[in-house]
Amino acid sequence: MKLLSVCAVALLAAQAAGASIKHKLNGFTIMEHSDPAKRELLQKYVTWDEKSLFVNGERIMIFSGEVHPFRLPVPSLWLDVFQKIKALGFNCVSFYVDWALLEGKPGKYRAEGNFALEPFFDAAKQAGIYLLARPGPYINAEASGGGFPGWLQRVNGTLRTSDPAYLKATDNYIAHVAATVAKGQITNGGPVILYQPENEYSGACCNATFPDGDYMQYVIDQARNAGIVVPLINNDAWTGGHNAPGTGKGEVDIYGHDSYPLGFDCGHPSVWPKGNLPTTFRTDHLRESPTTPYSLIEFQAGSFDPWGGPGFAACAALVNHEFERVFYKNDLSFGAAILNLYMTFGGTNWGNLGHPGGYTSYDYGSPLTESRNVTREKYSELKLIGNFVKASPSYLLATPGNLTTSGYADTADLTVTPLLGNGTGSYFVVRHTDYTSQASTPYKLSLPTSAGRLTVPQLGGTLTLNGRDSKVHVVDYNVAGTNILYSTAEVFTWKKFGDSKVLVLYGGPGEHHELAVSLKSDVQVVEGSNSEFTSKKVEDVVVVAWDVSASRRIVQIGDLKIFLLDRNSAYNYWVPQLDKDDSSTGYSSEKTTASSIIVKAGYLVRTAYTKGSGLYLTADFNATTPVEVIGAPSNVRNLYINGEKTQFKTDKNGIWSTGVKYSAPKIKLPSMKDLDWKYLDTLPEVQSTYDDSAWPAADLDTTPNTLRPLTMPKSLHSSDYGFHTGYLIYRGHFVADGSETTFDVRTQGGSAFGSSVWLNEAFLGSWTGLNANADYNSTYRLPQVEKGKNYVLTVVIDTMGLNENWVVGTDEMKNPRGILSYKLSGRDASAITWKLTGNLGGEDYQDKIRGPLNEGGLYAERQGFHQPEPPSKKWKSASPLDGLSKPGIGFYTAQFDLDIPSGWDVPLYFNFGNSTKSAYRVQLYVNGYQYGKFVSNIGPQTSFPVPQGILNYQGTNWVALTLWALESDGAKLDDFELVNTTPVMTALSKIRPSKQPNYRQRKGAY
């Protein structure tokens, strides 16, 4: 493209001016909404124009992270996650609600304990985090059924359409959940500022009406009727314009879409496919919804990983810190005003809540690990970007222009996208034209500034863009009234402290940078080396040039101190808001941003507040760490770190410096091998004496499932009988006539499922599973049978969750689990009479604390023996490391004590060894919560983190395992251990354990 004409630049600048009312506060320019009509919608707190949201009258960039409370069933840990996201510079969290967990039985909505939303709202409010509520009814989310409860398989209507049967099925759930969300809205003093009806309503087939305005309007009306008054936003799966404002019935207030541009090939984490970097989002936005702020409701922050995949460490390497630099700054180049990163904390698919395409871990390669660590470099990189945006309110006033390979950079190897302001600052996003490039490219810039068009660097040398990197260069950037004419180094943050100002800049290793400040003052290097540093006055501007060094420099120009850092050093800096007390952190606003301080402190800084003459920091440490406070208020004299008064020194630049000594505690964990394991055969169904008279009969002549018609005399679809989760067991009775030689059975459990079949006590064989197979047809040869004798076929199926329902019209979620068809050679199918079971009670599930999906249909699960304190004293002593000598399923339980010192966040993991060739499957229960499904022959997961609150760090714990040997030689665990990673000295409040009801004899258990 050729250089933008003067007219084009002027047009962009004019658009950037907008028509907002503005006033000054602490050096910030606050932009208030200019349109009274949009202030008086259903509420006055959250409004918008074409550039951004306004919250409480202030223009605000929403930088958000996706978190699912149901994937961390310890409510007292939610604050920890919120504080770590707040520390990124973010101001919002988006969350799904999983319908399947709240309405396990039609008409019975239950949202208590771990499933209650109110504690999630309270934690968000305490951390100063706004919320975007996304309760569906459909969520996708890699959740079982896409969040749909299994009983929807029986709905006589097409899902996600205006079919009356489906709409009626959603009424109870949405009425309850939306009413709960409504109570948490900003209008009621809560954190919820946006509400999303439906999710990714973006594609259809099979003659379904689409897009169906009547359907979307129904979902919207459900929310509004329940009290939702905040703006409604949608999440289109691409820039398709579905339900955008102006499209008529079913339109939302604000249009948004998602994007996962790098894809999900974690097996090749270094491969960035050609052409995958978005380039048209600005044009798409102006086409689809030009009157609303540009909104990316889900932008890639990691990747899912299937059964048999490379693992989430590889996913974190795929969507890594380099990805963030290139892709997130590219999002900024389009003027993104609502940017939500999916996932920022992934969590765990505990208790069978995941879909068949994934395993127990939902780490997602996110910035926060599954165990809530912030040790991935991508977390630190994201903190640089988040705090830059937070400190740059003029970004929202700049108008994005077209990307170009000429006119700004002096090489076509680089592409520059301008965001031009009108006296409010401009931004220039630079990347490689071939975004996959790993070359280091030298360049100079031609920048339009208030001092004219300048070629940068002015003092000689060149800039460098390293491979898989991107930069945001600022022009006429306002730092509390001081004009930064330009900076090639990137801005981390800036602050005004009393009569001085601080600007923090950073660059990559070995880079050369230049800064120009519209001041006449002299330049002083007040800390660090003068080598490889030059400065010059050019008319009314001071120009400074330097080579990036690992050693910090502080340069003073007038009342402005400029911290020059390398990127790795910048990772250690934090910008906590300065709160009034320790009760809560304020929401992000111009005022709270202006009152923040800057802290250098390593692993994590959570909060800062003043009380009397003291400055109080709450922070976490994973090593001995130097601590510095930049901008301590003038009225404080004492420093407290995690409540302890700390001595400090004050240098000539007013920086407080001290240190925190780290000495890891000795963590003594029990040996799992040495526990007093008790054993129970949890497949008594194959014993000749077993009585299944109490079991539900599979006696339905028809199926209500509209997706798959019956091919059997009776339905064997598990959801027809209310069984939607975990292991299924079928028992088929027949009287032999002597001709039976084979049994064919087609079972379906979802990707990577397994099954085993017995005839009486004779093992016939197993399908050990493959990720590629959601169902499988097996043929088993029968032993010789005697005419007139009774026989029982026992079929065990490991179901892996219900399919998602992304494409409207497919009703894919209705794909049944269980036996799809069977044939007993020489006999009619009606010769077999079937019974089946899943979890005890099915939809009348027994454990209301752990929810409707947590347990399956094995004998020990039906009895509740997986819970603490089962009646195991008289059971046989046997270890899962000795295992089973033949096919079958064993149940093992043991107790152990932990004594983890308080004040330490110690991630714990149950690790399985895996060197045997025999296929086996394990379920891991911890204090009654199913926290792992291990499949030896598929993987990849062998390490299962379990959080404090599920594990009792100071007290007694119960661990239970189900071990399913699928092959004739049996199976045993190669190894099983409880391990920890680096203890973190934490300011985290005391963790309250989730409820862990003990075993009680269950009425009607069979």
Swiss-Prot record:
SMART domains: BetaGal_dom2
Entry keywords, A to Z: Carbohydrate metabolism, Disulfide bond, Glycoprotein, Glycosidase, Hydrolase, Polysaccharide degradation, Secreted, Signal
Listed InterPro entries: Betagal_dom2, Betagal_dom2_sf, BetaGal_dom3, BetaGal_dom3_sf, BetaGal_jelly_roll_dom, Galactose-bd-like_sf, Gly_Hdrlase_35_cat, Glyco_hydro_35_CS
Keyword NADP: no
Reaction it catalyzes: Hydrolysis of terminal non-reducing beta-D-galactose residues in beta-D-galactosides
Any Pfam family the entry gives: Glyco_hydro_35
Disulfide topology: 205-206, 266-315
SUPFAM superfamilies according to UniProt: (Trans)glycosidases, Beta-galactosidase LacA, domain 3, Galactose-binding domain-like, Glycosyl hydrolase domain
Any GO CC annotation of this UniProt entry: extracellular region
Binding annotation for substrate: 96, 140-142, 199, 260, 364
Any one GO molecular function term: beta-galactosidase activity
Any one Gene Ontology BP term: polysaccharide catabolic process
Sites carrying sugar chains: 156, 207, 373, 402, 422, 622, 777, 914
Active site: 200, 298
Biological role stated in the UniProt entry: Cleaves beta-linked terminal galactosyl residues from gangliosides, glycoproteins, and glycosaminoglycans.
Family per similarity comment: Belongs to the glycosyl hydrolase 35 family.
Name the record gives this protein: Probable beta-galactosidase A
Species in which this protein is naturally found: Neosartorya fischeri (strain ATCC 1020 / DSM 3700 / CBS 544.65 / FGSC A1164 / JCM 1740 / NRRL 181 / WB 181) (Aspergillus fischerianus)
Lineage, top ranks: Eukaryota, Fungi, Dikarya, Ascomycota, Pezizomycotina
